[in-house]
Amino acid sequence: RVRSSAASDVYKRQANNRGFDTEIGCAFEMPLSEVACVSCGQCIVACPTGALTEKDNTQQVIDAINDPEKVVVVQTAPAVRAALGEEFGMPIGTNVEGKMVAALRRLGFDKVYDTDFGADMTIMEEANEFIDRVKNGGKLPIITSCSPGWVKFCETRYPELADNISTCRSPQQMFGAVIREYYRNPEINQGKKLVSVSIMPCTAKKEEILRPESMTNGRQDVDYVLTTTEVASMIRKSGIRFENIDGESTDMPFGIGSGGGVIFGVTGGVTEAVLRRLQTGHSRVEMDRIRTSGVRGDDGLKELTFDYMGKEIRAAVVNGLGNADKLVKRIQSGEVSYDFVEVMACRRGCIMGGGQPVGAGPRTRKARAKGLYDTDVNMQIKKSNENPMVLALYEGLLKGKTHQLLHRNLGVTEN
C-alpha cells in the first residue's frame, strides 16, 4: 500500500511475498489495469527501490521541435518554477521562472507561456459557476475539478457526485483550448502545424489530455505533457548550464498572470483565489484577511466560513485522497455541510505532485509553498478579474466560445 496521503486508500503498490522473494508491485499481485490507480504518480515518490518513473514523452517533443513544419509552444504550471531549481542544486523553493523560460527557448520552443494565465481563467469561470449555483439553487457543494487524480478517484468511488463536480476545465486544459483557438489564425501559425506542450508537476495530467471531456470537438487541445523531472532531464542533456543563464520573460499575449493564479500550485490556493475574486476590495488589508482566514497551512482538512451577498458560505479545503475519502463520507452522512469544497489529490497540492523531484519531506513542502507565496506577494496583480489580458480575451477570442473552450461535460462514470 502506498504510504502517501495522495494515494492513501488506493492500494496501488505494496510489498508482495517475504524475505528474498519480496517484490514491489500492485496489491495482491493484481495487474495495474485492475487496481484503483488514479495516475497521481505518488507511487513514484514512495517507491522504495526508486525504480518507478513517469511515461517519458521527451523524445516526441524533441522530434516536434526539430520538425520545420511545426510550431511548438509550451505552457508552464506555477508549481514547476518552485521545484525545478532543485534538480540543479539550487535552494528548495527558489522561483526559477526566468531561468526556466530562457532554458525552454534554448531547447527550441517557439513560444513560452505561463499557465498562471490559464489559472486566472479557471478562477473566473469557477467563481461564476459558484455564484450561479448559490443564486439559482444549483447543486451544492460545488467541488473543484482542477486535480485530475481526484476526478478519477471520484469516478471510481463516488459517481453519484457527478453533479457536484465543477464543469470548469483545469488551467492546463482551458489554456490549451485557448492556445489552439489562437493559433487557428493563419497569420499566427504561418502555415505550420501547432504542437502544444505543457510542463506540469503532475503525472495525472498526461492522462487528462486524453480524456474525451478534455478535448474540443474531439481533438486534443494539449498534445504532450512533460513533468518537472522530464524537462530537467532535457535541459541537462542539452548541455545548458541552468544555474548560469539569465532569466527571460514569458511571451505575450499570454504572459501576464495574477497572484491568485500563482498560488494555484498550493493546497488552498484555488479557494483563496476564488475568495479574492468574490470580494470587491483589493487592498492589502483585504488580502491579509483572506490569507489569514484559515485557507493556508499543511493540515489535511481546513474549514472556513466567509460572507457573500449576506449569506454565510461554508468552505472546506482537503488534500490527500485518504482525507478526501473521509470528508465525502462525512458529507454524505449529513455530519457536515459545505457550499464550496476544494480537493487536491497530492498532499500540499501541485507542489508535491508525482512529477516533481523525488525525495521531498515536510521541509520541502514548506519551502516550495513559501516560494509560491513569496512570488504572490511581489505580484502587481492579485486578483484574476483584474488581469487586463484575461479581460481582453473575454472581449475578443473567447466571445461566444466561453462554454465550448473553458468547460467540459464531466461525465462521472464507473470504470
Predicted regions: what is each one?
Residues S4, E34-C40, I44, L140, ...:
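Residues immediately within or flanking Cys/His clusters that coordinate Zn2+
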Residues A6-A7, F20, M100, F175:
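Activation loop
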Residues R1-A7, Y11:
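Single conserved hydrophobic/aromatic residue that forms the stacking wall/gate
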Residues E54-N415:
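Iron-sulfur-associated redox domains of electron-transfer enzymes in respiratory
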